[in-house]
């Protein structure tokens, strides 16, 4: 039995007894956005029904694992996915699995407020690190073990592998930027396609995502060995990557994925024609307006509404995630009190603003470069999400910056 959740081609040929995939053209299941783990979870529940087991007990036994996978797979947090994550987070607040407790402790989030974002940025990368750099066996053993000391050992190993993954990611990212700098036609291309020998397969997708965000262009990174390249791509709103690869299938060995993320195999002898064809397709599909990143603001907010009480009320709408994002607000005509880059490589931004004698603290992840052109005393408009900062037992309202515009 094969379980999958990737977009299928029209014809599926296999010797399998069954293929469970809500995206099959002949599947009429009403919710087709399940993560891979969600499809496997549904199979487990079906087997429970078949064998006369109490489905509530089986659901509660595995929903924590299904939650981790659903968040890590970055699928739309709607419908059944949202139900799975909502139920799973309640269990993960006090995890019963020894391995999950161990990885949460190593990540520094055990016994702290937990939401989908915590899983996405603190837990999922560590669990994924083993599979990205080699074998996923370490993560599997962690989730299965009943030995506390072994769980601690495995969690520390995954934490180390995650740091190695981050180092490899930085190296590939820097090499990708060098390739971009050497391309005289880069600005004319709507799709970034970069190829390098022996880039790490498990990391190129993350780097493609970073470049996609940085340049706001679809991006495909390809690692090649012995004349064959394996690629991973990420896309922007308005450009269906699976459709684009379908259009270019004559240049590819094979491919698969979704609208926003996909993988491919290509003979390097065909790479130039592939780059030409996918950019030709992008020229037909994407307008200049599509290439301009936007921040969708749900509503303007006055400084009087930026309170801890309102931040707590918003948190009751959790879980938030893809296609069900936390509301984005706008605050106009605030004055900058302090601004500074913070974190490793000054990658992030710490900002303090004031309006009508109310001081507000903000953090901008990946926005460190804003400190170069926004200064103390400037008047700014900001787009933000309201959050709660937990520090030494105290709670304060904190704004997560999405954009800043100087007046």
Predicted regions and their residues:
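Mid-to-C-terminal polyanion-binding domains and interfaces
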Residues: 150-154, 160-194, 247-407
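Structural motif
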Residues: 1, 17-19, 38, 189-193, ...
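N-terminal small/polar loop signature for handling phosphorylated ligands or for N-terminal nucleophile
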Residues: 1-13, 19-22, 171, 175-178, ...
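Short alpha-helices
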Residues: 13-52, 59-71
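Short gly/pro/ser/thr-enriched loop/turn and capping motifs at secondary-structure boundaries
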Residues: 6-11, 26-28, 226-229, 239
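Short acidic, glycine/serine/threonine-rich loops at helix termini
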Residues: 11-15, 31-33, 76-83, 204-206, ...
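Hydrophobic helix-and-loop "lid/oligomerization" segment in the mid-to-C-terminal part
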Residues: 49-270, 290, 294, 300-301, ...
């Amino acid at each position: 039995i094969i379980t999958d959740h990737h977009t299928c081609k029209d014809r599926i040929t296999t010797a399998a007894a069954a293929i469970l995939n809500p995206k099959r053209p002949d599947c009429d299941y009403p919710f087709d956005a399940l993560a891979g783990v969600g499809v496997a979870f549904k199979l487990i529940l079906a087997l429970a029904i078949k064998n006369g087991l109490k489905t509530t007990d089986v659901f509660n036994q595995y929903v924590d694992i299904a939650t981790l996978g659903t968040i890590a797979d970055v699928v739309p947090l709607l419908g059944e996915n949202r139900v799975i994550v909502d139920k799973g987070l309640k269990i993960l607040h006090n995890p019963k699995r020894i391995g999950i407790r161990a990885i949460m402790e190593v990540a520094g989030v055990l016994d702290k407020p937990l939401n989908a974002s915590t899983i996405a940025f603190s837990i999922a990368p560590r669990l994924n690190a083993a599979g990205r750099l080699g074998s996923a066996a370490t993560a599997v053993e962690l989730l299965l073990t009943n030995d506390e000391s072994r769980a601690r050992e495995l969690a520390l190993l995954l934490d180390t592998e995650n740091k190695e993954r981050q180092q490899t990611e930085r190296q590939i990212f820097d090499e990708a930027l060098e390739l971009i700098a050497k391309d005289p036609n880069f600005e004319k291309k709507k799709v970034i396609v970069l190829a390098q020998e022996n880039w790490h397969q498990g990391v190129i997708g993350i780097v493609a995502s970073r470049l996609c965000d940085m340049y706001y262009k679809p991006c495909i990174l390809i690692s090649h060995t012995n004349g064959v390249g394996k690629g991973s791509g990420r896309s922007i709103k308005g450009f269906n990557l699976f459709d684009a690869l379908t259009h270019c299938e004559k240049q590819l060995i094979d491919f698969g994925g979704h609208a926003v993320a996909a993988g491919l195999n290509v003979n390097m002898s065909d790479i130039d024609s592939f780059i030409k064809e996918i950019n030709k397709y992008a020229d037909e599909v994407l307008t200049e307006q599509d290439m301009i990143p936007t921040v969708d603001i749900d509503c303007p907010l006055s400084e009087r509404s930026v309170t801890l009480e309102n931040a707590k009320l918003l948190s009751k709408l959790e879980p938030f995630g893809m296609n069900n994002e936390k509301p984005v607000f706008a605050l106009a005509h605030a004055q900058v009190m302090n601004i500074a880059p913070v974190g490793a490589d000054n990658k992030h931004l710490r900002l303090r603003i004031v309006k009508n004698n109310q001081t507000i603290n903000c953090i901008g992840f990946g926005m460190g470069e804003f400190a170069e052109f926004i200064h103390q005393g400037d008047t700014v408009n900001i787009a933000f999400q309201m959050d709660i900062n937990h520090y030494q037992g105290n709670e304060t309202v904190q704004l997560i910056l999405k954009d800043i515009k100087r007046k």
